[in-house]
């Protein structure tokens, strides 16, 4: 059973920002933002044609500045946010804005893979997230499964909840909270939990993870020294409401139960340099992706702490007598956690990995040299999980 070869797409600029087009659940589509100091920056809309194993692309100009973070609306295929650098009075500021792509590009491209002659189109600015009083924006996260009207941005030591009004053309600051403590505290990343009616957000600053209640903007849990060095990223298990994963500069990936934060439930130490990204699969939470500046992407099978630790359990009525004994044996033993695959198509630091929002078995990774790689979960594992 041969696996499909990875598909590689090269951007002409350096890049570190990647997101699936979250509201698109039929076509496999990713958005990539570039980081160029000399030229106009771009957002590449990457369409993956699964049947022919080829990539089609469209390019949008992002003239506001180099893109550090990109995030797509869960409700509107055409709307996205970016965090970008701009210079003002010889200072560099990281700002955030909400944009709309041209209507005809929302549902993908029919451009041939090698057609680079077409002119790039520009994004329509819907609104800025005003950060004059709050500092540099680290990231923007959308309310999961929401109507695309609520976002949270992290700016220096502030967590800001925004209401998007008038078709996203106006961002109103609904509430905010600040990190208090010694030194210059700064958020590095955050995720919005899909559980608890979307009332919880987790953030990382320095080596600490914190949970926040978005209704009162108060802290609900705190994991100090979650990592030995800076925490780079975190993600919530989509199927287990108290579980989250974190990764950092100590080369580790840790899994936490927020009801008992004294120590991690599990720790992975497979990378040899900083781990920049951790992502749970949206459907099968045992599948966890990580990307690191050791230039590798690792797919792990964390089945023992997943929502199906005994594998796919079959209903008793569905089992014939001959199968009965075999399946009983199988279901008694929890399956073992392991590294499924290490992907080594990158030659530079991998700053972003993410799953497709349309195909649960497909993911993309992006390295700083502008190389985007599309890979799939190995077929043998896919069928093992499904059957």
Curated annotation (Swiss-Prot):
N-acetylmethionine modification, residue list: 1
Keywords: Acetylation, Golgi apparatus, Phosphoprotein, Repeat, WD repeat
PROSITE patterns: WD_REPEATS_1 (PS00678), WD_REPEATS_2 (PS50082), WD_REPEATS_REGION (PS50294)
Positions with biased composition (Basic and acidic residues): 322-335
WD repeats: 4-48, 55-101, 124-164, 172-214, 219-258, 263-302, 338-379
Region (Disordered): 310-335
Intrachain S-S bonds: none
Locations listed in the record: Golgi apparatus, trans-Golgi network
Main function: Acts as a component of endosomal retrieval machinery that is involved in protein transport from early endosomes to either recycling endosomes or the trans-Golgi network. Mediates the recruitment of Golgi-associated retrograde protein (GARP) complex to the trans-Golgi network and controls early endosome-to-Golgi transport of internalized protein. Promotes the recycling of internalized transferrin receptor (TFRC) to the plasma membrane through interaction with endosome-associated recycling protein (EARP) complex.
Subunit structure: Interacts with two multisubunit tethering complexes: EARP composed of VPS50, VPS51, VPS52 and VPS53 subunits and GARP complex composed of VPS51, VPS52, VPS53 and VPS54 subunits. Interacts with SNAP29.
Family affiliation: Belongs to the WD repeat EIPR1 family.
Identification of the protein by name: EARP and GARP complex-interacting protein 1
């Amino acid at each position: 059973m041969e696996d499909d070869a990875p598909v590689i797409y090269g951007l002409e600029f350096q890049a570190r920002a990647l997101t699936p087009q979250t509201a698109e659940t039929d076509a496999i589509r990713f958005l990539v933002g570039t980081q160029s100091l000399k030229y106009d920056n771009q957002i590449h809309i990457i369409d993956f044609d699964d049947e022919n194993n080829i990539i089609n692309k469209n390019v949008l100009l992002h003239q506001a500045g180099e893109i550090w973070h990109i995030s797509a609306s869960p409700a509107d295929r055409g709307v996205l946010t970016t965090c970008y650098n701009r210079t003002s009075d010889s200072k560099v500021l990281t700002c955030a804005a909400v944009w709309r792509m041209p209507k005809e590009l929302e549902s993908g491209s029919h451009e041939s893979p090698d057609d680079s002659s077409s002119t790039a189109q520009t994004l329509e600015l819907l609104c800025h997230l005003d950060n004059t009083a709050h500092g540099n924006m680290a990231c923007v996260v959308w309310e999961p499964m929401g109507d695309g009207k609520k976002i949270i941005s992290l700016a220096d030591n502030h967590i800001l909840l925004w209401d998007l009004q008038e078709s996203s053309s106006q961002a109103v600051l609904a509430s905010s909270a600040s990190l208090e403590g010694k030194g210059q505290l700064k958020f590095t990343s955050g995720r919005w939990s899909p559980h608890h009616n979307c009332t919880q957000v987790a953030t990382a600053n320095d080596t600490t993870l914190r949970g926040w209640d978005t209704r009162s903007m108060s802290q609900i849990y705190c994991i100090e020294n979650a990592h030995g060095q800076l925490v780079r990223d975190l993600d919530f298990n989509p199927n287990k409401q108290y579980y989250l994963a974190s990764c950092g500069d100590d080369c580790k990936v840790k899994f936490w139960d927020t009801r008992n934060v004294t120590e991690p439930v599990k720790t992975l130490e497979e990378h040899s340099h900083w781990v920049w990204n951790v992502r749970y699969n949206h459907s099968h939470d045992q599948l966890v992706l990580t990307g690191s500046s050791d230039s590798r992407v690792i797919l792990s099978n964390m089945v023992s702490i997943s929502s199906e630790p005994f594998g796919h359990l079959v209903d008793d009525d569905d089992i014939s007598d001959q199968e009965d004994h075999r399946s009983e044996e199988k279901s008694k033993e929890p399956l073992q956690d392991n590294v499924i695959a290490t992907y080594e198509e990158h030659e530079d630091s991998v700053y972003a990995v993410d799953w497709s929002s349309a195909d649960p078995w497909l993911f993309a990774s992006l390295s700083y040299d502008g190389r985007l790689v599309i890979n799939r979960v190995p077929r043998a594992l896919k069928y093992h999980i499904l059957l």
